[in-house]
Amino acid sequence: PRLDLLDMPRYNGSGFGVGIITKLAQAYYQTADSEKFSGQDWRIRPVEEVIEEVRNLNTEFGIQKVFFIDSGFNIPMSSAKTLCKAIIETGLRIRWNTYLRPGECDAELTGLMKESGCSLVLFAEGRSESSVTGRLKQIGNLADLCREVELPFTLNITFGEPGETGHSVQQKIDFLDNTAPAFATTRVGARVLPNTQMAQVALNEGLIKSESDLLKPTFYVAPDVRGWIADRLREESKKHPRWHLS
């Protein structure tokens, strides 16, 4: 890309930094079927290429903050560790951020991430567990690993997914309170994507007539919470300055 045509120094002081791709694959969406994020179509970028791009951004434009574009940087964990070790060994002094997906992670990886310059981790609800309790436990385990190495993290929690009730809403709010992320995004409604279980639910309940309707952004909110969930989250956001309602 012709980065020389852009005002690159501005990236050092805003946002998450300049994006660098570390892996190409089918995108991971928390509302999509989890088995589609299996890794069979992954194309992991060679570590040498990633390191070279980081180095060029630094030497040519003075960029010291980058964002590793990856829906699940920690998957596979071996590749994530290899990249972190390479950053450390080459002496690149950068700050970087990325997404982690609940599941495949350990203390060695979060320690390497911190040592290699990671300053913020973003993660959302996983879908390998069907129950709210199971998914929140996965997120909590990942949060504990980050907290042990003083690695700040953010949370994105969806409210209104199929089966959502007043009880599960309270579960999620209590979880956010207890986990205390650097900041949190609470989302009203789950995005409906084609060829997913969510799309079938939307069809069954008459939210859409066919999947062609999904050419326009469509969100599902469970009937039990539809009438009040937005107001409830708005009130919670007022009490928690670091919670953002989306």
Model-based region annotation:
Residues 1-154, 159, 174:
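Radical SAM [4Fe-4S] cluster-binding motif and immediate context
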Residues 161-163:
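Short, solvent-exposed loop/turn segments at secondary-structure junctions
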Residues 29, 75-77, 165, 192-196:
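Short catalytic/ligand-binding loop motif for oxyanion handling, primarily in non-cytosolic enzymes
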Residues 7, 17-19, 152, 167-246:
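C-terminal accessory regions of radical SAM enzymes
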